[in-house]
């Protein structure tokens, strides 16, 4: 399985003004924007970390997901939420011949934590032996910062501020996440039962 981001979050969607206010940086100076590239980097790092911990796409972007077989032919759970649209479904055989599956043969079952690609009939199309299925989908809470739930938006600002304030710290342990951030994102994390984990 290979999950790829096909589109990036545009700079205009990043909450740079809100982040500067959160950090209490001075304003009204000729060089107000001198740190913008650095601040954008911390915001992108915080977004990526929270998306990784929660399995959620925060700001809308397109993904492609390549897999060798369906987890269940009656419905394939998608690896990221919330999904707003399935853009395409393509089957490729071992010699890379493509078969585009018509949108009338599948549907999106929306779910806040575990959206599922479902067949319109009884089963999803058979993935060719030695081939793959590629699902292209759009996921995220919306196109702008204001579309995020308030607690996730606050978690991003807190984590980006943590990265900014500890930018020269090298002794932090791996996976370190401030308690306030961890508690804000906890309800968005996937629950894993019976050791199967997310697939």
Region spans (language model):
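Divalent metal-cofactor coordination and adjacent catalytic microenvironments
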Residues: 1-199
